[in-house]
Amino acid sequence: MKKIAILIYPEFSIQEIGDIMYLFRWHYDIKTEIIASNSDIVVSEEGVCIKPHKTVNEFVKEDYYCLILP
């Protein structure tokens, strides 16, 4: 099943990705995966720590409907 990829970066807004993840998961039944430049934990501007599912190098575009850049 294809998913939606969301690219995160240091000091991203957790609200931006949270709303997108909620929308796709509960309104369209599409799961999301978090992508980052490396596998290190990324800290949002609110101080929330997120461990990405995959790195940019592991991203395979055929596995996803799209890549969202918040």
Question: Which sequence ranges carry the predicted segments?
Answer:
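Extended, subdomain-level signal for the structured scaffold at the beginning of enzyme domains
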Residues: 1-70
